[in-house]
Design a protein with these regions (language model features):
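Short, low-hydrophobicity acidic/polar segments
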Residues: 1-42
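Intrinsic-disorder/low-complexity, polar/charged segments enriched in Ser/Thr/Lys/Arg/Asp/Glu/Gln
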Residues: 21, 32, 119-121, 163-165
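Tryptophan-paired
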Residues: 43-162, 191-194
Length: 194
């Protein structure tokens, strides 16, 4: 979605030359955020052990046991839960979001970027003015629907027409610690969590 405007003056005299085209600068009223996890290796090790333990009739399995099947990260579901309000309607006349909802969520899948990193998902959000923020929690589920992890609420800083990438150990997260983000940013930023 884009928004733009420009002025043109029309005259009644057909002899006056009018411009063939008019340039309109377009701008997105949206900001994009994306989560990238950097603990894929640890997650695969943990899941291999869990799967081997489950296959052995819930006997304890050590990390040296051979898993019954290879772990395919694309088999896992990622669910993003918006905590609080999520803007979902935009007015072109006021150039601002005009409505928001609670209880919004969306699903994604893990997409491997490297041996240790995977994209968890992304979304576009209408931004009021120049800067804003949304708060999300991220849940990881196996193909049977079992929740494997859930993050604490994470505040995502947003800036209109920019892409914010948040990087951290999200696959192994438990809802116990917090993630903090510096909201003073300019342009596209890749935020790395230790």
């Amino acid at each position: 979605a884009f928004k733009g405007s420009n002025n043109i003056t029309l005259v009644a005299d057909i002899m006056e030359r009018l411009p063939d085209t008019i340039n309109v600068a377009m701008q997105r009223p949206l900001a994009k955020f994306e989560f990238v996890t950097n603990d894929v290796v640890e997650f695969i090790d943990k899941e291999s052990t869990r799967i081997a333990s489950k296959a052995n009739g819930n006997k304890s399995a050590s990390s040296d046991d051979t898993p019954t099947r290879a772990v395919n990260i694309e088999d896992y579901k990622v669910v993003f839960y918006y905590v609080g309000f999520m803007p979902h309607a935009y007015s072109m006349y006021t150039d601002k979001p005009v409505d928001s909802s609670t209880g919004v969520m969306f699903e994604s899948t893990l997409r491997k970027l490297s041996e240790s990193e995977a994209s968890m998902g992304f979304d576009y959000v209408f931004v009021n003015g120049k800067k804003s923020a949304v708060t999300v929690q991220i849940g990881i589920y196996d193909n049977e629907g079992t929740q494997l992890s859930l993050t604490e609420p994470i505040e995502v800083p947003l800036k209109r027409s920019h892409h914010t990438t948040l990087t951290g150990m999200f696959l192994m997260s438990e809802a116990s610690g917090g993630v903090t983000i510096n909201p003073d940013f300019d342009g596209d930023h890749n935020l790395i969590f230790p």
